[in-house]
Curated annotation (Swiss-Prot):
It comes from Homo sapiens. This is Xanthine dehydrogenase/oxidase. It holds the Pfam family MoCoBD_1. Homodimer. Interacts with BTN1A1. Disulfide bonds join C509-C1318, C536-C993. Its cofactor is [2Fe-2S] cluster; FAD; Mo-molybdopterin. Residues 4-91 form the 2Fe-2S ferredoxin-type domain. FAD binds at residues 257-264, 337, 347-351, 360, 404, 422. Detected in milk (at protein level). Substrate binds at E803, R881, F915, T1011.
Length: 1333
């Protein structure tokens, strides 16, 4: 049968595709076929929003053009017939003009690495196309499907607030917490209230937007016909009528129906499932209809969830409240269901038929008694969605030929009450741990139960109803006895085995009770409002807040920084909030990342083949099936390596595993083929047989088996025995700190291009470490380093994850290019990246602290254990830094810290922002908080009492000079109004039984330098051209931290020329050799001094010409020097002086200086669910004399939010066999827009120049991250209040809270009558779903 032509529009241009393949996504088509690289691949599963585009079509049922955002990574091109696609390139560019959305995110400093920026731009653009004057709430909701790992979200929201009709300036009324008039303080120096000037923004003019393609508009009344698209393996049929659809289903009962592809697309990509026949019913009117009937509202099964949501919102606004109880429950679930990109395309019917056991909506539909209409050729039936509808895992009552035609969501009746609940790891766009729909119907005029439905997701392999429990409650009164009986019944009926998939067994069981208790209280409250209190009892006022749905105030933020001195030249940009130099290009999609480089004509694609066993011998590798895949070129392995297969920082790694694998994800080989799709299929065809060996997975396993790398590391000072003997109190404890995935938005990527002579090869790499990439590739190929050129334009984030681990990809790709003689490209998929490349080290610490009754610490002993993985990588240096930071900011006269590196069968863990420091400091604050509790003293008082003073020696004997921490502490106490708010928190906790607040203030001291002395060096190369323009190169790489921008500012001041004359193109090994990695927060310090040195050389050469022509211009002096045959090219070099520490003698300076900061955070926890919200954070940070306040504040906020993820949200789950469960944004949750503090206030400490760094600045990348521990300990403070109330224990009780403080840990720590009903016994031989590594 002949395939049809696919016709759609992209940015106004008509596209006619004669060979549309149903397996091709819009993202792949845009990037590879149309060359539109602005739309990015971040995850491939619709979870990050980097691929967001706007789709527009004429909706025949609504009779209007509709615009909606969508994830291009999931949208099959075959679904786009007669659709207009708008990408970031289509709304504006630097060559023409930026769209106001692009301009505002750039100028408000909302783009750092820039990889997420195009997707965020398109989410905002789509919102404005539908709502030119949105509310701030609508703006925040528009980004529920977008993630950013760099900025901390604040500048994005602040920039886009200028579009809001309820945002921006308050007109001087002072009624806005962000009022600019409130920000100007009476200081001796001028503080700036704004990082950008909104009045300079281009106004939004909706009339100037591109029009919908007239050709598509003319087709709106043309009858649709069935379409057929044939791919390599899959056929796609677009049915145009219901009859066609039913006939197709009868002919092909196994065909999959696809509307949004948000489920099937995931199964095809990540579960390797193949569906040869796909039928799309999206055009069929009956499946898209919305009908208001006498019993409820019916939605066609293909209705997008966004239509369901809008319809129900309208109904709730118009109908009596009593009639819309169910609607409000559905809306509460849809509120957190997913991002706009998913809700705009995912269908309500697809959500039901997918039959997910953790569905957000199915428990609600089941509890409401929703009716489903099922049809097949010749039959039609209506069934109620009850406990029989899902007979098993991912199964429904539908026969193979049947389809779901519609769902009727019922109106609620008089005396009927309904609630819906969901608890996930993250509030926004997250898969539920437990969901529930609950309904009760009372006999008229009474509180006697006539019907009760309690339905749950996440408590079995399907959506279930607690029938035994509910049947027992019929005819009972809505009173305490019923509550107790239901809770006892649920605990018994919904019991989970200890090895249940998904884990968190006690938490999930407790949630079933907590949800019912909330429902019970909500109904009690409503009955009271209806004057039925006498029949059911009165709601305790302290319980009332437990019934409140989550609400968040509009974001409020303050940024304070010291303005440049009066008289500073307008051209001197040092100290000014200059936007990131690439921000405009990033916002328009023009910035080029590694995978954006146009494909070479003869380019090949590579896919890694990795181990599925944690520890095993390789018995055989069979590539016969891989070779059958079209486009297959070769398989490479250790046997193909021409040089050395030994690699890694410590020479304990291999490029490819040869005889044995030592972790799941260990690279065994790679498949090379003509396209990424073919390489993926071929890689799946490689069959490996293993002989399994015993594996060590956890820190406890390593300790038990004495599995360590190297000897014990130790720092010791004072007389520990004497210190403990003199202490009034001694407390011992243990804390575990989980690992963290880097989750840079751009995964690892390398393009290797063989040059065809003398072994030369050019590599384009997303790496922080050009030198190691060069040397590792050269060693593997057996050629000198001078034959390998490594080039880095920019990275889409790094955070330490691309310091060493990028080489595991680069070496494999280089070998493939060497073997084939052709360019080879590899960009890891998100799941591969997370599986292979490691992350932050998990730590286990055992501590013992001695202290006086006054709170003064006199002795400390801490044993640190880190889970290193299967190779050492940078782990020793990371442990060393943890030991250097085990004091945080506190003077401890007698101290001993030890560190052991646990050798395990996990992928090697590596550098991550903070580099061991955050782990060491969290442990310190853990025992410090316990000192305060034991002494019965305010925590802030104990912390202040133990702080170092100017001139003190640390435990590693480095003298503290320029110790600004006390100033940061006092400023933060004052600006946060700590003491007044502490009283308010205490008052709130007395008045609220089931919600508690906590407040905490935390300091940080972070050492600046590589602790390996020889790395503290940098080079720069500066070319001045005869037109006066300057090309600058330095050894640092740009990953969003603004390093290139700062270096241009440094050069601009040094040369006394505008920044517009200076350009940085890239970082490469053939311009600046032997570079240190861009890491340790020192890149601006090191490279800034090298740039300065190069500038001084040029200035010295130009000096004679300036003297000859003092009134001349820069160009005049440059031309004169050139004519006089003077070199206009110079190198610069810098090394940090006086560094070098000895562990043997505990002497020498490991650091050049320290950065300091203090944060105060307030949180509110829901004791029943473990949910929490971050109410407010105040930060005071010492960054010296800021080179660029906008970039520095962005680093403070971004680091803080990344720390917020580390300490409260991000959790890696490994199976007992060492396989990572959490391999993408659907299972691993980084902070989202809604995760940040509602009030976020950042102040840079004024008048604190740092004489040890370029232009008196300070490092800023890593130091602020630990300040997020203020949220962790505020949560612990709130839990303490809950435990004191519900257990009757003394507030001096010590309890353990490991990091991260997830909802599970918070809820389980809030011990109460519900948790005691849900304690699961774990049999000795039970193998849990996940283990703590």
């Amino acid at each position: 049968m002949t395939a049809d032509k696919l016709v759609f529009f992209v940015n106004g241009r008509k596209v006619v595709e004669k060979n549309a393949d149903p397996e091709t996504t819009l993202l792949a088509y845009l990037r590879r076929k149309l060359g539109l690289s602005g739309t990015k691949l971040g995850c491939g599963e619709g979870g990050c929003g980097a691929c967001t585009v706007m789709l527009s079509k004429y909706d025949r049922l609504q009779n209007k053009i509709v615009h909606f955002s969508a994830n291009a990574c999931l949208a099959p091109i075959c679904s786009l017939h007669h659709v207009a696609v708008t990408t970031v390139e289509g709304i504006g560019s630097t060559k023409t003009r930026l769209h106001p959305v692009q301009e505002r995110i750039a100028k408000s400093h909302g783009s750092q690495c820039g990889f997420c920026t195009p997707g965020i731009v398109m989410s905002m653009y789509t919102l404005l196309r539908n709502q030119p004057e949105p509310t701030m709430e609508e703006i925040e909701n528009a980004f529920q499907g977008n993630l950013c790992r760099c900025t901390g979200y604040r500048p994005i929201l602040q920039g886009f607030r200028t579009f809001a009709r309820d945002g921006g300036c308050c007109g001087g009324d002072g009624n806005n917490p962000n009022c600019c008039m409130n920000q100007k303080k009476d200081h001796s120096v001028s503080l700036s209230p704004s990082l950008f000037k909104p009045e300079e923004f281009t106004p939004l003019d909706p009339t100037q937007e591109p029009i919908f393609p007239p050709e598509l508009l003319r087709l709106k009344d043309t009858p649709r016909k069935q379409l057929r698209f044939e791919g390599e393996r899959v056929t796609w049929i677009q049915a145009s009528t219901l009859k066609e659809l039913l006939d197709l289903k009868a002919q092909h009962p196994d065909a999959k129906l696809v509307v949004g592809n948000t489920e099937i697309g995931i199964e095809m990509k990540f579960k390797n499932m193949l569906f040869p026949m796909i039928v799309c019913p999206a055009w069929i009117p009956e499946l898209n209809s919305v009908e208001h009937g006498p019993d409820g509202i019916s939605f066609g099964a293909a209705c997008p969830l966004s239509i369901v949501e809008k319809t129900l919102v309208d109904a709730v606004a118009k109908l009596p409240a009593q009639k819309t109880e169910v609607f409000r429950g559905v809306l509460e679930q849809l509120r957190w269901f997913a991002g706009k990109q998913v809700k705009s395309v995912a269908s309500v019917g697809g959500n039901i038929i997918t039959a997910s056991p953790i569905s957000d909506l199915n428990p609600v539909f089941m509890a409401s008694g929703a009716k489903l209409t099922l049809v097949s050729r010749g039959t039609r039936r209506t069934v109620q969605m009850d406990h029989t509808f899902f007979p098993g895992y991912r199964k429904t009552l539908l026969s193979p030929e049947e389809i779901l035609l519609s769902i009727e969501i019922p109106y609620s009746r008089e005396g009927e009450y309904f609630s819906a609940f969901k608890q996930a790891s993250r509030r926004e766009d997250d898969i539920a741990k437990v969901t529930s729909g609950m309904r009760v119907l009372f006999k008229p005029g009474t509180t006697e139960v006539q019907e009760l439905a309690l339905c749950y997701g996440g408590m079995a392999n399907r959506t279930i109803s607690a029938l035994k429990t509910t049947q027992r409650q019929l005819s009972k009164l809505w009173k305490e006895e019923l509550l107790q009986d239901v809770c006892a019944g649920l605990a018994e009926e919904l019991h989970l085995p200890p090895d249940a998939p998904g884990g968190m067994v006690d938490f999930r069981c407790t949630l079933t009770l907590s949800f019912f208790f909330k429902f019970y209280l909500t109904v009690l409250q409503k009955l009271g409002q209806e004057n039925l209190e006498d029949k059911c009892g009165k709601l305790d006022p302290t319980f009332a807040s437990a019934t409140l749905l989550f609400q968040k105030d509009p974001p409020a933020d303050v940024q304070l920084f010291q303005e440049v001195p009066k008289g500073q030249s307008e051209e001197d940009m040092v100290g000014r909030p200059l936007p990131h130099l690439a921000a405009d290009m990033q916002a328009s999609g023009e910035a080029v990342y590694c995978d954006d480089i146009p494909r070479y004509e003869n380019e090949l694609s590579l896919r890694l083949v990795t181990s599925t066993r944690a520890h095993a011998k390789i018995k055989s590798i069979d590539t016969s099936e891989a070779k059958k895949v079209p486009g297959f070129v070769c398989f490479i392995s250790a046997d193909d390596v021409p040089g050395s297969n030994i690699t890694g920082i410590c020479n304990d790694e291999t490029v490819f595993a040869k005889d044995k694998v030592t972790c799941v994800g260990h690279i065994i080989g790679a498949v090379v083929a003509d396209t990424p799709e073919h390489t993926q299929r071929a890689a799946q065809g490689v069959k490996i047989t293993y002989e399994e060996l015993p594996a060590i997975i956890t820190i406890e396993d390593a300790i038990k088996n004495n599995s360590f790398y190297g000897p014990e590391l130790k720092i010791e000072k004072g007389d520990l025995k004497k210190g403990f003997s003199e202490a009034d109190n001694v407390v011992s404890g243990e804390i575990y700190i989980g690992g963290q995935e880097h989750f840079y938005l751009e995964t690892h990527c390398t393009i290797a291009v063989p040059k065809g002579e003398a072994g030369e090869m050019e590599l384009f790499v997303s790496t922080q470490n050009t030198m190691k990439t060069q040397s590792f590739v050269a060693k593997m190929l057996g050629v000198p380093a001078n034959r390998i050129v490594v080039r880095v334009k920019r990275m889409g984030g790094g955070f330490g994850g691309k310091e060493t681990r990028s080489t595991v990809v680069s070496t494999a790709v280089a070998l493939a290019a060497y073997k084939t003689g052709r360019p080879v490209r590899c960009m890891l998929d998100r799941d591969e990246d997370m599986l292979i490349t490691g992350g932050r080290h998990p730590f286990l610490a055992r501590y013992k602290v001695g202290f006086m009754k006054t709170g003064t610490v006199v002795a400390l002993e801490v044993d640190h254990f880190s889970n290193v993985g299967n190779t050492q990588d940078l782990s020793q240096s990371i442990m060393e830094r943890a030991l250097f930071h085990m004091d945080n900011c506190y003077k401890i006269p007698n101290i001993r810290g030890t560190g052991r590196l646990c050798k395990t069968n996990l992928p090697s863990n590596t550098a991550f922002r903070g580099f061991g420091g955050p782990q060491g400091m969290l442990i310190a604050e853990c025992w410090m908080s316990e000192v305060a509790v034991t002494c019965g003293m305010p925590a802030e008082e104990v912390r202040r009492k133990n702080l170092y003073k100017e001139g003190d020696l640390t435990h590693f004997n480095q003298k503290l000079e320029g110790f600004t921490l006390p100033r940061c502490w006092e400023e933060c106490l004052a600006s946060s109004q700590y003491h007044a708010r502490k009283s308010e928190v205490d008052k709130f906790n007395k008045e609220n039984c089931w919600k508690k607040r906590g407040l905490c203030i935390i300091p940080t001291k972070f050492g600046i330098s590589f602790t390996v002395p020889f790395l503290n060096q940098a080079g720069a190369l500066l070319h001045v051209y005869t037109d006066g323009s300057v090309l600058l190169t330095h050894g640092g790489t740009e990953m969003g931290q603004g390093l290139h921008t700062k270096m241009v500012q440094v050069a601009s001041r040094a040369l006394k020329i505008p920044t517009s004359k200076i350009y940085i193109s890239e970082t490469s090994t053939n311009t600046v050799p032997n570079t240190s990695p861009t890491a340790a927060s020192v890149s601006a310090d090191l490279n800034g001094q090298a740039v300065y040195a190069a500038c001084q050389t040029i200035l010295k050469r130009l000096e004679p010409y300036k003297k000859k022509n003092p009134s001349g211009s820069w160009e005049d002096w440059v031309t004169a020097a050139y004519m006089d045959t003077v070199s206009l090219s110079a190198t610069g070099f810098y090394r940090t002086p006086n560094l070098g520490y000895s562990f043997e003698t505990n002497s020498g300076n490991p650091f050049h200086y320290f950065s300091y900061g203090v944060a105060c955070s307030e949180v509110e926890i829901d004791c029943l669910t473990g949910d929490h919200k971050n109410l407010r954070t105040d930060i005071v940070m010492d960054v010296g004399s800021s080179l660029n306040p906008a970039i520095d504040i962005g680093q403070v906020e971004g680091a803080f939010v990344q720390g917020l993820g580390l300490f409260t949200l991000e959790e890696l789950h490994y199976s007992p066999e060492g396989s990572l469960h959490t391999r993408g944004p659907s299972t691993y949750k980084i902070p989202a827009f809604g995760s940040i503090p509602i009030e976020f206030r950042v102040s840079l400490l004024r008048d604190c120049p740092n004489k040890k760094a370029i232009y008196a600045s300070k490092a800023v990348g890593e130091p602020p991250l630990f300040l997020a521990a203020s949220i962790f300990f505020a949560i612990k403070d709130a839990i303490r209040a809950a435990r004191a109330q519900h257990t009757g224990n003394n507030v001096k009780e010590l309890f353990r809270l490991d990091s991260p403080a997830t909802p599970e840990k918070i809820r389980n720590a809030c011990v109460d009558k519900f948790t005691t009903l849900c304690v699961t016994g774990v049999p000795e031989n039970c193998k849990p779903w996940s283990v703590r590594v």
